[in-house]
A protein has these predicted regions:
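N-terminal helix-turn-helix DNA-binding module of bacterial transcription factors
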Residues: 1-47, 313
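Short beta-strand segments enriched in small/hydrophobic residues
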Residues: 3-8, 45-58, 155, 163-169
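Short histidine/acidic/glycine/proline-rich micro-motifs that form metal-
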Residues: 12-14, 58, 88-89, 169-174
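ATP/adenylate-binding site constellation spanning eukaryotic-like Ser/Thr protein kinases
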Residues: 23, 49, 68, 123, ...
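Bacterial carbohydrate/catabolite-sensing allosteric modules
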Residues: 32, 73-78, 127-128, 132-313
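Short gly/ser/thr-rich secondary-structure transition/capping motifs
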Residues: 33-38, 92, 110-111, 233
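Alpha-helical recognition/docking segments in bacterial nutrient-uptake
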Residues: 47-154, 158, 213
Length: 313
């Protein structure tokens, strides 16, 4: 048999040009030999790699794995696989990773950037997820953070809290500014805001400690995320204060196990898996050449009330 005939028989786009009996015979022989098409050669021919690059800043962040899972499941169902890269919150590494994924002919990118001020990827369809890049004009899929923060402040108001503070992460992230701006709009522009250098438990403990040492005499804290909230727990305990008897605390994200801490954390739940699904669907629509669709997709949040909030003391 001519090699060209065998090649056409193995090409899923061309078997109709070859007799069915020949196609079956060639494929049976290929299976017996363990033959698999070379994806690199196929991508050079079709100009499609079958891969999408997914860039995240820190896979140890408990918010990100469910988002990545939603992306992966949706893309796999459409015949695409993910190339996952962790940038360790390093902007230079992020730029290098994006260049490498483009060099590998990724058909698109889904990116959670290390910072809001970094350069946006160019030359390949890109969707931003959870974190925006200033001035990029790229589509963003995220939770409706403002809605969630408003719900947290309203919940505390119902308990009689009037002096509410916001302990949050670094201003280098769009997540921080979205939640901070929503807090100020809901709690008042003079409500104190303290920034930690990361969205971590140690950063939350340090920032909350700064708040307490400043002489703040409030009764409630809206934390920028759940890890910051757990850091606030530690700072309050170190200062001899009890949550929620002395100070109520809310978190944001509803990450795993925050219902198991003491007290169980009242928090804003974001649809983590659904964010990944929506980002993948938006990218697939763009790859298919359809309408560009919305530039911002904000998915609804919900307040989960647990034991860390109570009446103002």
């Amino acid at each position: 048999m001519h090699p060209g005939t065998a090649s056409r028989a193995l090409n899923p786009e061309l078997p109709g040009r070859i007799a069915e009996a020949t196609v079956l015979r060639v494929r049976a022989a290929a299976d017996a030999l363990g033959y698999r098409p070379d994806p690199t050669a196929r991508s050079l021919r079709t100009r499609r790699s079958g891969f999408v690059g997914v860039v995240v800043p820190d896979l140890t962040n408990p918010v990100l794995p469910p988002i990545v899972r939603g992306i992966e499941e949706t893309l796999w169902g459409a015949g695409l696989a993910c190339l996952l890269a962790d940038t360790d919150n390093d902007l230079e590494r992020e730029a290098a990773v994006v260049d490498e994924l483009r060099a590998r002919r990724c058909e698109g990118l889904i990116v959670a950037s290390a910072t809001r001020t970094g350069p946006a990827p160019e030359g390949v369809p890109t969707i931003l997820v959870t974190r925006d890049i200033d001035g990029s004009g790229l589509p963003l899929v995220a939770a409706d953070d403002a809605e969630g923060v408003r719900a947290a402040v309203a919940h505390l108001r119902e308990f009689g809290h009037a002096r509410i503070a916001h302990v949050t992460g670094p201003l280098s992230l769009s997540t921080t500014s979205r939640r901070r701006d929503a807090f100020r709009a809901a709690a008042g522009g003079d409500a104190p805001v303290v920034h930690g250098d990361a969205f971590t438990i140690p950063a939350g403990e340090h920032a909350c400690g700064e708040l307490l040492r400043s002489g703040w005499d409030g009764t409630a804290i809206v934390a920028g995320n759940d890890l910051i909230a757990l850091g606030c727990y530690a700072a309050l305990a170190a200062a001899g204060l009890s949550c929620p008897r002395d100070v109520s605390v809310t978190g944001h994200n509803d990450t795993p196990l925050v219902d198991r801490v003491q007290p169980p954390l009242t928090t804003v739940a974001i649809p983590q898996h659904e964010i990944g699904v929506a980002a993948a669907r938006l990218l697939l629509a763009r790859l298919a050449g359809g309408p560009d669709g919305p530039e911002r997709v904000l998915l609804p949040t919900r307040l989960v009330v647990r034991g860390s909030t109570g009446p103002a003391s």
